[in-house]
C-alpha cells in the first residue's frame, strides 16, 4: 500500500493518506495547492485601470502651466493609444452605421426594382406593315 503525505497549507502538519493495494507502493508527496481565495489574492492584476495608474519616476519631466508633469511609461502610453483608437472607432460607428444602413436600403430597393423589371418580357415594337 502506498502512503501519501498531503499538506494543505504551509506550516500545518501533513495528513497521511493510505491508498488501496492496487496503487504503486511508493510514497509520493503531493505539492501544495492554494485555495481559490489565496490564488486570487496572490495574482497580479490583469491590467491597470486608468484610475489606479501609478506613475513611475519621471524620465523627462516637462513643465506645463507652471506645474511639473510626469512622463508616461510604456504601458501608460500604450493604454492611452488604445483608448484613443477605441474612441475614434466609436465616433466612426456613430456616423457610418446609419449611412451604411441607408446605402443598404437603397441597394436593396434597386435590386427589387431590377428583379421586377426583369420578370416582364420586353414588348416588341409596334410594326405596321
From Swiss-Prot:
Membrane topology listed for this record: Single-pass membrane protein
Q: What is its main location?
A: host cell
Sequence segments annotated as region (Disordered):
1-25
Q: Does the keyword Transmembrane helix apply?
A: yes
Where does the protein end up?
A: Host Golgi apparatus membrane
Chain span(s) of sequence motif PPXY motif = 44-47
Residue intervals passing through the bilayer: 100-120
- Keywords, alphabetical: Host Golgi apparatus, Host membrane, Membrane, Transmembrane, Transmembrane helix
Q: Which GO terms describe its cellular component?
A: host cell Golgi membrane; membrane
Whether Membrane counts among this entry's keywords is yes
The text of the family note is: Belongs to the varicellovirus ORF0 protein family.
> What domain comment accompanies this record?
Late-budding domains (L domains) are short sequence motifs essential for viral particle budding. They recruit proteins of the host ESCRT machinery (Endosomal Sorting Complex Required for Transport) or ESCRT-associated proteins. Contains one L domain: a PPXY motif which is involved in the interaction with ITCH, a member of the NEDD4 family.
Q: How does it assemble?
A: Interacts with host ITCH; this interaction probably mediates ITCH degradation.
Q: What is this protein called?
A: Membrane protein 0
Amino acid at each position: 500500500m502506498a502512503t501519501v503525505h498531503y499538506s494543505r497549507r504551509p506550516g500545518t502538519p501533513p495528513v497521511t493518506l493510505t491508498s488501496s493495494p492496487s496503487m504503486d507502493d511508493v510514497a509520493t508527496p503531493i505539492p501544495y495547492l492554494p485555495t481559490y481565495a489565496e490564488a486570487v489574492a496572490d495574482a497580479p492584476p490583469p491590467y491597470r485601470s486608468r484610475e489606479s495608474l501609478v506613475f513611475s519616476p519621471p524620465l523627462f519631466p516637462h513643465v506645463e502651466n507652471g506645474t511639473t508633469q510626469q512622463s508616461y511609461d510604456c504601458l501608460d502610453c500604450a493604454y492611452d493609444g488604445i483608448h484613443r483608437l477605441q474612441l475614434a472607432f466609436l465616433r466612426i460607428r456613430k456616423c457610418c452605421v446609419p449611412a451604411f444602413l441607408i446605402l443598404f436600403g437603397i441597394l436593396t430597393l434597386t435590386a427589387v426594382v431590377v428583379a421586377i423589371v426583369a420578370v416582364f418580357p420586353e414588348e416588341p415594337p409596334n410594326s405596321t406593315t
